[in-house]
Amino acid sequence: MSNKDLLGRRNFIKGMGAAAGVAMAAPALAVSENANGVKWDKEVEVLIIGSGFAGLAAAIEATRKGAKDVHIFEKMSYFGGNSAINGGLFAAPDTPMQKQEGVKDSVDTMVADQLAAGRGIADEALLRHVAEHAVEALQMTLDAGSEYHPYLQQLGGHSVARTYQTTVSCGAGITQPLLQECRKLGVHTHNRAKFDGFILDEKGGVVGVKMREGYYFDKPESGKLVRIKARRGVIMATGGFAQNINMRMAQDPTLTAEVGCTNAPGATGEGMFEMFRLGAVPVHLAHIQSGPWASPDEGGFGYVSNYSIYNFPHSIAIDRLTGKRFMNEIADRKTRADAELNCRDAQGNPLPPILITSYEDSKQHPNTKKVLKYNVGWKFDSIDALAKHFDVPLAPLKKQIAEYNDYVKTQSDPQFGKNMTEAKGKFIQAPFTVVRLWPKVHYCQGGVQINTNAEVKDSLTGKPISGLYAAGEVCGGIHGVSRLGSCSIPECMVMGMTAARIMMQA
């Protein structure tokens, strides 16, 4: 079975460029109103807020299920949201490429890996629902024209290699084909259209929204207010709040403006806040994830992140103060980020650790050329030159490399228990490529609570709020304490597809 047809059915389009917390939000807040006496400016069948993975998948699925009048509203000037600049990594179990590579995997195995990272508070039912439908979502991207590297990656916390990555190494390799597919299907797409609140019926159900058309992100009060009736309901796919400094500091005071962030500017959380005001259950808001693959030498997600993600399995992370490894390079994100933050100099100041890789192995990833070209990575012909450049004690470093290369030979890491499968035959040897590591805020595990129908739950009754669905990072509680890398895209897409299906059945 080919990489193009995961389900037995039948190119890339170039990329682009809790209630208490509500009061602290930086963005201007929306206010919901009652539908009695409302003069509707327009009426649509399916109304979707947000144009990332979740919103685009919902629109395509709604159309496939018979919807004739589907509208996507995006507050920014460009479509794709934060999804367009993510790493383009998609995890799915029991795929054709796994069979080709001899990787044994299953829904149960993928769920077990995620539950371990969730540290006891992840939502198993939602994780299982996503895993069961992940291949179907992956097929949607392939049908739309997404292209992936012809190999799988084993990301941190995953027990096997199950991750696809777009050939452009970013989410635009998925969002742009999905956006084009939406337009082919007749989905109406509106940018510079900001959500400004829900419109409710007499029972508190969602029957429409207020929007501001002609909105400019740098002018919070801009745009013309319009009221739009949604016959089948509203799907909120508005993303997380990692760029809302006040909100994230309310959850974790250490996440100040000085802490880097990989997210797009629009990840400010207004949609989530308004659902809280409506009565949605807030879940796990304090669990905000930092990416351990980020670099202090570039802004945002940059080039190093995908470089590191690819190379972690066959590289060593070194504490520059000691010259020794300090973590399992493919542990889950929280474990690694916490370990990196403990790397300090003798005075207790941050001392970003380094990731050392054999150039012969690192060059297999296209970002290697970019990290070297833009001086956010370095190439050395000897370990002596490397140690001198980063002021790392030479003797301990040489000893550590020799010990690690023995682990590669024996396929066993007694030091940190790293799974050495993907490191087989890949020794740490000259020439070397090196990048510096330091975590950046990347993902919000918290948001509104949903069920496996993507329905938003009411905090008083525990029942779904009529007419309201949510999918993607705006939802909370799914992953628990820590989300595994490459599990966000399948979650967003599967829950967006689910919301559309349930809405069309209602």
Curated annotation (Swiss-Prot):
Binding positions for FAD per the UniProt entry: A54, E74, N82, G87, G88, E473, I489
Keywords: FAD, Flavoprotein, Oxidoreductase, Periplasm, Signal
Locations listed in the record: Periplasm
Keyword Oxidoreductase set for record: yes
Name recorded for this polypeptide: Acrylate reductase flavoprotein subunit
Keyword Signal: yes
Activity response to pH changes: Optimum pH is 7.5.
Ways its activity is controlled: Methacrylate acts as a competitive inhibitor of the acrylate reductase activity and suppresses the reductase activity in dose-dependent manner.
Active site location: R333 (proton donor)
Signal peptide annotation: 1-30
Assembly and binders: The ArdAB flavocytochrome c is composed of a FAD-containing subunit (ArdA) and a heme c-containing subunit (ArdB).
Function: FAD-containing subunit of the ArdAB flavocytochrome c, which catalyzes the reduction of acrylate to propanoate and supports dimethylsulfoniopropionate-dependent anaerobic respiration. In vitro, can use the artificial electron donor methyl viologen. The natural electron donor is probably a low-potential cytochrome c. Also shows weak activity toward methacrylate in vitro (at a 22-fold lower rate) but cannot use other tested 2-enoates, including crotonic, fumaric, sorbic, urocanic, cinnamic, p-coumaric, caffeic or ferulic acids.
Enzyme Commission number(s) from the entry: 1.3.2.-
Upregulation: Part of the ard operon, which is induced under anaerobic conditions. Expression is further induced by acrylate and methacrylate. Not induced under aerobic conditions.
Cofactor: FAD
Pfam families reported in the protein's UniProt record: FAD_binding_2
Family assignment from sequence similarity: Belongs to the FAD-dependent oxidoreductase 2 family. FRD/SDH subfamily.
Entry's Gene Ontology cellular component terms: periplasmic space
Post-translational modification: Predicted to be exported by the Tat system. The position of the signal peptide cleavage has not been experimentally proven.
Sample GO molecular function, one term: FMN binding
Stored PANTHER family: FAD-DEPENDENT OXIDOREDUCTASE 2 FAD BINDING DOMAIN-CONTAINING PROTEIN, FUMARATE REDUCTASE
